[in-house]
Every structure is written in structure tokens, then in C-alpha cells.
Amino acid sequence: MSGSGGVANSSSTAAANNTAATFQHIFEQLVQQGGGNHKLPPKQLEQLRHLLGNVRDAKNLQMIVEKFKNLEQFHEHYAAHLANNNTVISTEDSNDLVKDNARKYGSGGQTLTPRHTIDAILGLKNRNGAANGSGRNPETVSDGSVDPSLGDDDATDLRCGMTLTQLRSMDNHMASMLQQHAKNGGALPYGPPTPPGGQQPQVPNATPLHHGQQMGGQAGHATHAGHGHPTHHGHAPFGYHNAFGFGQGGHGYGHPEEAAGNYLNSMHQMVEANQLQTGANGANPPPAPLPPSSFGSHQQHLAALAAQAQEQQNQHSKYAKSSPTGAGPPPPPGAYFMESQTAPVAPSQINYDERSMSSASDLEEDDDDAAKLQLDVTSPPTPSPRGQLAAKRKSAGVFCDDNEPKLANGQLPGGNYGIRPRSMEEVHHQQQSHHHQQQQQQQQQQQQLQQQQGFQHDFRNSGNGNPNGNSNSGDHGERLNADSDSLVNGSCASSEDLNQTNSSEQGEKITSGSDDEGQDDNCAKKKHRRNRTTFTTYQLHELERAFEKSHYPDVYSREELAMKVNLPEVRVQVWFQNRRAKWRRQEKSESLRLGLTHFTQLPHRLGCGASGLPVDPWLSPPLLSALPGFLSHPQTVYPSYLTPPLSLAPGNLTMSSLAAMGHHHAHNGPPPPHVGHGGHGQPQPPPPPPPHGVPHPHGSHHVVPLSHLSPHLSRMSPHATSLGSPHHGVTPLGTPLHSSLPPSSTATTVAVSSSQSSSSSASLECSGPDVCMSPQNLSIGNADSNGDGRDLSSDLDAGSTSSNPGSSLDKCAASANIELLDVGRDSPPPPPTPTGKGSSTPPTDMRSNSIATLRIKAKEHLDNLNKGMVSIV
């Protein structure tokens, strides 16, 4: 089939025709083998023949392959049941088969729920009743599950996946294993086989019906005999696995969650039936039914079953207190077990089941064993509602829940110790008591843990109204058991589960030290874990510029910035929070380092990039790779973290660079050329400056790498002195100021004129022992974010180039009122500290450093506000 499928996918018309002919030949052969045209519905034949005519379509080919699979499986069923003339393939069955197979193998990818998986493994949905010979009429085509939509929506329909012969052999093997285990030693390992419906599996009917009628293919429709659905013919496998099943009282098999227990119930019943056959010398054996072939129709089958049940019921009427006799046909197979039919059989057949038919002393032991095992595989996942049958059973005194102590004490009338129905309440009560014991043990463990751990985790549980983390109600027992499982599986506990603080979770919380995060935060992390935001170079550049202006921008500034950089305002706010934390961290560490080393070695925060540029730590390698294009653009504004480093003589002190400032080193010009100095202060001639007004495309090439500098020199970018207006007398570009400087000073001021007359910038690079390198004259006149130069007094120019150290200090102090120390820099500049020979100020400790810095910031900010130089956005 696969080979012909491959041919059908070819584009050749001849190959497609040959394939179509092959498919048609196989199809006709299958139809003839399957019993001729009258066995298949006409619409199905027409549809298949039409598809076979269009094999070249790949979609049609897939459908044809699926249909042929179904037809071949139909053929297997025909071979097994060809003698049965009542076998009819309905259109709905065929369509459902194609649809379900397409669901299983197609691209839909329907999720399989655990119930589907269990049903598929156990074959409970193998509901091709017609192929198994249920004798249905074509018009009675609904599912055996009473709810037709239940079967249609099932994605794991295995109706054609396993023949009845395979099912029968599997069941026989399972039954023999269970029977052998019961003979060898005792209790079944699956927990009590007594179903939670409150009744034992019915035994006298089980023997002949299970092995005679059902195995013969007449498919246990007795399930529906007592349901008031005599015309609702269930599919064979449902009857097969549900002959004594869950349909209690006036409702049919309407609870899909009960399907999980059906298969194992039938297994237990087969074991019990086999044991009954070996020891069937007891009183009142049931009459043997007719062979299945003798029943002409399904109705006769049901009538025979009803008559047989009625006869048994009449024989043992004194035990029939709970069986409804007047509501139509009696329901022997409608529930797990009718007391009236099994009561007399029990005393003579103690080997019926060591668990449910044992003596009084064994009952307590078995129940305890069942509670320990907690493997009650016969109970459905949820208790099913009970109908009239359960109500009447509950009203009967001997068969009620209070039957257990009477049985255990041997007080049952007639000395019959074998029958002890277990109702749903009893099973539930048993489970609850067991869970309660487990819960108490866990509570004791938790109390011990809490005594050790103190009050650290009480507040988490108090939010849920349970301050101690313990819960004494019975229904929390299951949650306590499931709590550790949910933690192991990684699933998030529900809000109710948060009342119980698991011991392992407490340990995790203590070791992690995150006492401020409760279990709700743990849930939120797993549910709402947000991806980390990756900032581009442009976004970081703009954010750093805004951070220079203000560490605490208001909401309007943040919103404007967020629109500018195309980020959510919340992300901008979080970035500022993180940036402030980083700034404080760096300020603290630098102050500590500077205080300890007496400024002999300055912080090396700014590393050198590949091209010799000192860059900030946030410029990671992927960001650095984008920098050349960013730098070569003529209109690019160069922040201070891209400016060349300042090399100083050993005796000089440098101020820590305030990166990402809003000032600009010439709007259209490159960074000013670096005047390199040796490690011992020898002056070197400056390199030729770039032509006036023409931006150098590779301005970064003027930067001298710092590898040749002395280790005590700092790798920092200097603060450019922005000279606001042309009346300062800035020397023309390219004119060195050596002539105006005394020989003792090697300070060089290179003025780079901007093409915009409103702003000119110059980099003041001072080197030599005579010049004061206080923070004031390093950060003089930093332009604000608008690029406007700040007005400086002309005497500051003279002071900065004066050879008199005293006057230089005075001018530096005078300029303190004007210059704005950058607020947004990673770390503040240190205050004036002792230099080689120009000052006698003692070194200050870290705290005074920080306080002095804050005072300077506040003072100069106020001064600039008064002068109107700082534009508040």
C-alpha cells in the first residue's frame, strides 16, 4: 500500500492512472471479500470510488489509505463473523472511523487526556459493535455509551484496532494470571475488587453470561436491561466490558469517568467466574443459558437474560430487599452486584474471592491491607450519582454502611459472612480516614519543622487564613498528598494548596534566603516569567543621556523617552531603577577603593575597546561591534564615554569620568585629538589637528591606546570644556597654545571649532605637577542635553592656563559656582585631593567623600537653576 501511495504522489499521469487502477482493483477485491456490495453502504462505495478516480491528489491519497486500512480491518471482522447475517456496517461507523483515524494520524494533533489514554490502552472505546456481531439494526446506530457525542469526540477510538479474538485471548490470559495469583497466595494485588457502587460483582450471572454469551459475540447488552433503555442497543465492547457495569438505577452508562474501572471489573468478574466454575457444587447454581447462536435477535437475548435473572431472584427473594422488582425488566447486570443472587452461593464457596468472600476475621485484615495499598483500581475517578437502586439499597438495614461492624463481629443474620457490600460512602470514608492519618503524620512533621524554623514562613500561610500552615479538614488530605507530587513534577500548586507548606519547599525557601517571596511569587514566576529586555545601542545611548540629566526623571520624561526609544514606559522605569542601583554600587566601591589607596591607583572601570576606545561596561561585544558605524556618522553626537582617555603625569590626580553626559564634543567634529604624554611627564608635540569644520571619518584613530601608560594612570575620558560663546577668545583651530603657556606647564588646550557658531567645544587636557586638576576645572562648562554651551567667565580661561598654582587653585574654586557636576555619571568625581606639591589638603575618608560630592552637586545645581542654564524637561 505504501509503495502504491508513493507512485500516486508522482506527477506522471500514466503512473497516477496505473495507481488508480491498482487501488480500484484492491478496493473491489476487498469489497468482494467483505461480503459483496450489499454489506457496505452505497454512499461509502460511491465515495471511495470517487476518491479512487482522483488519486493524483495527495490529500485524497491520504484519505484513501486511511479508508483502505479501515476496509482491511473490516475484512478481519468479516472473517471472524461472516456466519452472522446480522452484521451491518453503518455509514456513521465508517465515517467515524475515517474521522478518528485522521485525528490520530493527521495534523490536528489533538491532545490526549488521561481518560482517553486509559480507554485506548484498555480497549474500552473499541465500539465497532457491528463487526463484533452485536446484531444491531442499521437504524439503531448510536453509541453504547448512551451519550453519542462522547464517542464521536474521542480521539483514541480503537474500534478497528483490535479484533474480538485478540481481546478475548488477552482477557483469558489476564484472567488466568489473576486466578493463578489468587490461588497461589492470597489477596489480589489490585486492592478490593468490590466496586464502589456498594455491591459485589454478581456471580451466578457472571459465569455463564461472561463466558457463554459474551465470548460468543452476543455482547452483553444486558447492561441496558435494567436501565429503561431496552431499545438502546449498546456496542459490543461496551457491553463486553460493562456487563455488570456502572449504569445504576434509572440512568445508563452516562459517566465517562467511570470507564477506567470497567475493564478491571470485568477482569475480577472473570476470575471469580472461573473459580466458581471449578467449585460449583454449591446450592442453587444458575440455569445454563442457551448458546449464543440460538438467540434469533437481540430482543430474545435480553428476554432470556431477564427470565434467568427473574428465576434467580425468585429463588432468593428473602435477600432481595434492595433490588427493584417492579420497574420493568429486573436489572441484574445493571449494577455491580445484586445481593439476592449471590447471597446463597457465598457460604458454600468461600474460595470465591479471598478478599471479599473471606471470614469475619479476614475482613478487617483485608480492609486494612486495602487501605495501605491505596490501589483501588476498580473505583471510578469520581463517585458517580446513584439512582433508585442506590436509594433502596441504602434503606435496607443489613446492606447499609453499618453492615461492616456487624460483619466483622459475626453478627450477620444467617451466619453469612461472605456478603459485605461496600457503598460509595464507605469507600470514601475509608480513603478519608487513611488520608487523615497521613495528614496527621505530615502535620506532626511540619510542626517539628516549624519549631526548628521559627516564624519565618508563618506570614505566607496567614495570607490564606491558615497561620500555622496546617489543615485539619479531611478534604485537604488529598491536597497534602498531591502537594509533594506537584512540586516534584514542577507544576504550580493551586491557591488552596498554599495552605499546606511543604517541608521541602520550606527548605528551599530558607536556603535561598528569599523570605520576602511566598509561594504565590513562585507560582507567578512560572506562569508570568517575562523575557529579559535586550536594549539596542541606540536605546542605551538615549537612556544614558537621560540618566545624565536626571537620576529621577518624572513620569512625563519617562513617557517621552519611552516613545523615543520605542520601549514601554515600565521598562524605562525599571532601567532607571537598575541604573541608579548600579551607580550607587559603583560610587560606593570607588569611594572605598579611592579611600584605601589614597588615590594612587584610580578605578579602572572604563576598559579599552578594540580600537583603543575606553567604553563603559554595558557596551558588551555585540554592542561594540555596532560602534564603528555609530562613530563614523558625521552628525553623531559623541558622549563622553567615547572620548579619548586622559593621560596624566604621576603626580597629578584625575577625577573619575562622568560618562554619558549630555554635553557634546562638537556637533559635527570628531573627538579632539589626544595629546599623548609619557609616563614621566615629558611633553610630546601634539599630532596635527583635523582640518577646520571637516569631521574626521575615523576620529577614533587619534585615540592613543592606554597600554603604554603607567599602571597608576587612570583610564578615563576627560571632561571637555565647552566654551559657550565666541567672545571667550578661543584660539583658532590648530593653533597650539604653547606660546601662551609658561615653560613649566605642559598643559595643552586644543580648541576645536564647531561648524555651528552657537557651540564650540574644547578639550582641556592638563598635565604636569603645577596645574591643579581639581574636579572643577575638569568638568567646567559641560554642555547640557540641548547642546548649548555654558557661559564661562573669561578669567576662568586665564586661570586654567596660569602658571601660578595658587591662582590656579583660586580660579578652580571660583569656577565651582558655575560648573555642573554630572548627576548621571556612574560615579561622582572625588573632591579636590592633595596633588604632587600644589596642595596640603589631607586625604578624606569615604563618608566625607560622598557627603562632599553631594554638597557640590546640590550647590552647583542650585546655581545653575538660578542662572537658568539647566532646562527642566
Swiss-Prot record:
Appears to function in brain development. SUPFAM superfamilies: Homeodomain-like (SSF46689). It is found in: Nucleus. Residues 224-235 have a biased composition (Basic residues). Transmembrane segments: none annotated. One of its GO terms (cellular component) is nucleus. Residues 483-513, 774-785 have a biased composition (Polar residues). A motif (OAR) lies at residues 849-862. Its main location: nucleus. GO terms for biological process: positive regulation of transcription by RNA polymerase II; regulation of transcription by RNA polymerase II. A motif (Octapeptide motif) lies at residues 116-123. The gene is Rx. Residues 528-587 bind DNA. Residues 683-694 have a biased composition (Pro residues). This is Retinal homeobox protein Rx. It holds the Pfam family OAR. The lineage of its organism: Eukaryota, Metazoa, Ecdysozoa, Arthropoda, Hexapoda.
